[in-house]
């Protein structure tokens, strides 16, 4: 029998678990260091810009929602962490809703919880990857819409898909690979092909386009700002294209293995213990597992094609988070069908232990100097006041330093390390790395006529003793005349 989708009771329990996770994350974050992490500091500082159609190379959705939460609940570390952990929880929640369209409640719960065995989701996203977090949540929301539509063909699923496409398109550019690979996977399966010919799907594209049209118009009109981080791809010169592309493919392979090996290893262990059991998946569940596998294969193939066509010499593991969840579901769903009830409970217990272990490890890491959260921002602010009179200057710097100073001294003129525009008087520049060529940084800041003073190395205080320093490099920039 075809699953009827999640019941209200199942949705209620899933949401309750999400609330528990958010509460646990918040309690541990507030208990492990008062300073902002790098991504937290970025959001804190960018809030000065207010609502805009574009924020340089970053897509706007994360900022819009975070700034809205600041407006409603006030600007605090708690609000930043609640939004972050809510996105983490929603990623699993949406995965459960999507999987529940084809498999039972227990299998869909355990498969969705298996995301905790992906390093980029379980660990890296907890500390950084702000915009990747919201992309992953909206990728799963898109998965819900696809799965719901493939099961029922309902108009509500098409509307959901359109909204998910529009919001996802405002999260990160690699989000667009999600609907592409899901469409390719669905078209490759005869049971789903008829649904994909439904002309009502054009409505989803119209809804999505209506949501993204204004921000994408800003991107078209401001290409320099929008492409400011393209150097991350390490694009080659024509004469080195082949070798750089090979390096990029090696990088992609390396990070794909890093992203999937822990889960592959765990699946192999469990499969060895239930090899004698018959795979008792119902036909719909079997087709859905194939759908997930083909979507993952399409995603990885698109990533390879991108590296080859662009010549990108660098690839990062979290860029694959549009595809790795589907690979996880494709691995876990067939395994769950072969497991006994006891083995399923063990799998669930391991997922719970992984959540607890990850949160505990993060708490230890966050509170261990020179971890970013252990910075004594008040002591740093006092030092800058005494040395440079920073309270009377415009302070620009890397997000980490500037964000923490803006939080500690809200009355200061603190800005990101970008061209500052109109400034009255001198500028105090703070960087995490030494500036070897002050003339170059002045040109980049569009302060070509300014002069740079002597670089001063400061050693900020941390709230606990540390054997390792995290220096900050300071310079006074003086206007001409």
Q: Each PLM stretch: what is its role?
A:
Residues 29-44, 54-69, 75-78, 223, ...:
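Extracytoplasmic catalytic/substrate-binding loops of multi-pass membrane glycan-assembly enzymes
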Residues 126-134:
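Short acidic/glycine- and proline-prone juxtamembrane loop motifs at membrane-interface regions
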Residues 157-172, 184, 208-210:
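Membrane-interface alpha helices of multi-pass inner-membrane proteins
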Residues 179-288:
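Transmembrane-lumen/periplasm boundary regions of multi-pass, lipid-linked membrane glycan transferases
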Residues 370-374, 378, 382-435:
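Short periplasmic/luminal acceptor-recognition loop of GT-C membrane glycosyltransferases, typified by
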Residues 421-481:
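Aromatic/acidic, Gly/Pro-rich catalytic loop(s) in extracytoplasmic/lumenal soluble domains
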């Amino acid at each position: 029998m075809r699953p009827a989708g999640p019941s209200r009771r199942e949705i209620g329990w899933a949401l309750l678990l999400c609330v528990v996770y958010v509460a646990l994350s918040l309690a541990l974050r507030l208990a492990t260091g008062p300073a902002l992490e790098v991504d937290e500091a970025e959001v804190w500082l960018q809030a000065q810009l207010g609502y805009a159609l574009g924020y340089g190379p970053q897509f706007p959705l994360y900022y819009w929602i975070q700034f809205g939460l600041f407006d409603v609940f006030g600007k605090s570390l708690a609000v930043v962490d609640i939004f972050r952990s809510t996105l983490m929880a929603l990623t699993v929640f949406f995965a459960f809703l999507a999987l529940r369209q084809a498999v039972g409640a227990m299998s869909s719960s355990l498969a969705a919880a298996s995301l905790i065995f992906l390093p980029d989701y379980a660990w890296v996203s907890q500390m950084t990857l702000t915009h990747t977090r919201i992309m992953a949540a909206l990728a799963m929301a898109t998965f819900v819409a696809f799965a719901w539509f493939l099961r029922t063909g309902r108009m509500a699923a098409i509307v959901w898909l359109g909204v998910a496409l529009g919001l996802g398109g405002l999260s990160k550019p690699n989000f667009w690979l999600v609907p592409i690979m899901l469409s390719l996977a669905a078209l490759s399966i005869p049971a789903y092909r008829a649904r994909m010919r439904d002309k009502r799907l054009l409505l989803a594209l119209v809804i999505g386009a209506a949501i993204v049209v204004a921000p994408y118009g800003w991107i078209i009109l401001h290409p320099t700002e929008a492409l400011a981080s393209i150097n991350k791809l390490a694009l080659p010169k024509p004469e080195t294209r082949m070798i750089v592309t090979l390096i990029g493919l090696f990088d992609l392979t390396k990070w794909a293995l890093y992203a999937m090996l822990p889960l592959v290893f765990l699946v192999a262990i469990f499969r060895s213990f239930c090899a004698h059991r018959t795979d008792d998946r119902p036909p719909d569940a079997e087709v859905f597992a194939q759908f997930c596998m083909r979507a993952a294969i399409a995603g990885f193939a698109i990533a390879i094609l991108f590296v080859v066509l662009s010549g990108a010499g660098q690839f990062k593991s979290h860029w694959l988070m549009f595809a790795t969840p589907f690979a996880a579901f494709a691995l876990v769903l067939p395994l769950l069908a072969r497991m006994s009830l006891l083995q399923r409970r063990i799998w669930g217990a391991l997922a719970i232990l992984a959540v607890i272990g990850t949160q505990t490890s993060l708490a230890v890491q966050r509170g261990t100097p020179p971890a970013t959260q252990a910075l004594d921002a008040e002591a740093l602010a006092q030092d800058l006041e005494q040395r440079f009179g920073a309270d009377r200057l415009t302070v620009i710097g890397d997000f980490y330093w500037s964000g923490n100073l803006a939080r500690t001294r809200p009355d200061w003129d603190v800005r990101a390390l970008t061209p500052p525009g109109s400034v009255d008087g001198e500028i105090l520049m703070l960087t995490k790395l030494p500036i070897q060529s002050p003339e170059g940084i002045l040109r980049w800041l569009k302060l070509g006529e300014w002069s740079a003073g002597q670089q001063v190395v400061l050693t900020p205080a941390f709230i606990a003793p540390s054997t390792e320093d995290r220096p900050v490099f300071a310079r006074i920039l003086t206007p001409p005349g």
